[in-house]
């Protein structure tokens, strides 16, 4: 059975590129356009990994990570932050919230897939 990954980004083209790379690697993908939408899309589903942007409307990625980590079912779900933010203090904020990896845009699909393969449980 394919592993499921939730991707959150307010940019449809980014969601499309990430989705194509993940589907090409055999993953199932659920897409959301911000943190509020992402929490709604989780809705008790089995999700093996989450990839989120930081700067999004309604609920940013750091707040989303904090909210996900409060949910017992997703407390240990690995989260990758995929963003244009590259400052160390933002990375520290993301890790403190519970993110396990940080990938800076622009990115190459193999770079993202490498981060995914290191974190997704077999």
Model-assigned labels for residue ranges:
Residues 56:
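Receiver (REC) domain active-site loop signature in two-component systems and cognate sites
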Residues 46-51:
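Active-site beta3 strand of CheY-like receiver
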Residues 26-33, 41:
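Short hydrophobic/Thr-rich beta-strand motif most characteristic of the beta2 strand and flanking loop
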Residues 53, 83:
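Active-site residues of response regulator receiver
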Residues 107-117:
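C-terminal output helix
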Residues 67, 105:
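A Lys-centered signature of the CheY-like receiver
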Residues 16-24:
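Charged docking surfaces used in two-component/phosphorelay signaling
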């Amino acid at each position: 059975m394919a592993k499921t990954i939730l991707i959150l980004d307010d940019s449809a083209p980014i969601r499309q590129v990430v989705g194509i790379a993940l589907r090409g690697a055999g993953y199932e993908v659920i897409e959301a356009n911000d943190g509020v939408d992402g929490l709604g899309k989780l809705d008790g589903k089995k999700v093996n990994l989450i990839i989120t942007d930081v700067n999004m409307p309604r609920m940013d990625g750091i707040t989303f990570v904090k909210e996900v980590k409060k949910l017992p079912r997703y407390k240990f779900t690995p989260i990758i932050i995929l963003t244009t933010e590259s400052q160390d203090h933002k990375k520290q904020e993301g890790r403190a919230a519970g993110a396990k990896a940080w990938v800076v845009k622009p990115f190459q699909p193999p770079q993202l897939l490498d981060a995914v393969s290191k974190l997704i449980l077999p």
